[in-house]
Amino acid sequence: GAHRAAARDLLELLLSTGMFGQAVVATDDPAWGETLADLPVVVDLDPSGEPFHFGPRLARLIERYGAKRVLYSGGASAPLLSAERWHEVLTRLGEAERLVVTNNLHSCDWVGFVPALEMVPQIAQETNDNAIAWLMAHGAGLPAVHLPASAGTRFDLDTPLDLLIAHRHPGIGPCLRRFLDELGWVSRQLDQVMVAMAQEGSSLAVVGRVSSAAWAALERATRCWVRVYAEERGMRASGRQGRGEVRSLLADYVELVGVEAFFEELAQLADGVLFDNRVILAARKLWPSAFDRFNSDLYRWDRVEEPFLRHFTRVAAEVPVPVVLGGHSVVAGGLMALAEALEIEQGET
């Protein structure tokens, strides 16, 4: 639901630029495709009975529509990117003969490129969209432009916690806003962390695969004292997680003193905590199901089946300071979105 709402917002925003010759929506959901009948888009349904493979699917679309210049995006990949930024991207793409432009060259959520047909052989080999901008720049030699790190370029909707974060930002589109209003989710922890962020002289702890850009955004937006415990950035992309090589000093400390004592100590150091707990899980060679991880993020600890994560979440819920649990986003794009939302709010008061 949220992804469809965000995709509708993105389509309407991009179409409003008047800079597209053709807009194609590739989906496996014919019912959702029918809801787009009022928009000037072509709905291209995934072939039935075939397993989905990202690279071959995108390559076939480029060939089918004879595209010279392509902007590819997942539906929920840029819920905060402004119309002005999109206009900048499309202008650059329209003026170039050889170019790749993206939000993040190392792990892209959307990418524009020209000449598209020339890129088809490389694209067809890719299993997902994360590496295609890097491939075009370094494998195919296209000149590359990536936008500066910001909430608009680094925040997307990957997890339920991202929906809670998005709901607090005034820049989301009307369809997503309406969906989240109707969803009605609340998070005491996130509300209280936002209060701490707005309070001059409060202390915040940011834990996990902390983005330097997110840390800088937090420093700009607040007048708080910030403790950063950064570990294992790139643990997935480097293959360390897959090989069981993730190491974490905090995970070792949790093992040494126990979960309760760990959180007791953390609560004495900060008035609010943003905690990417995936590093501790990976260091313990745990990777619970998405169901467990997301229920933990929402503090539905009673629905978490993995014993350590269930216990960790329950203890975090009882800490006297707010602890926002999540994945990478909570200390990267999501944190940048919270910082930007706070700046906008303070600018209006």
Question: Which functions belong to the PLM regions below?
Answer:
Residues 31, 35-70, 129:
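Short phosphate-binding loop-to-helix
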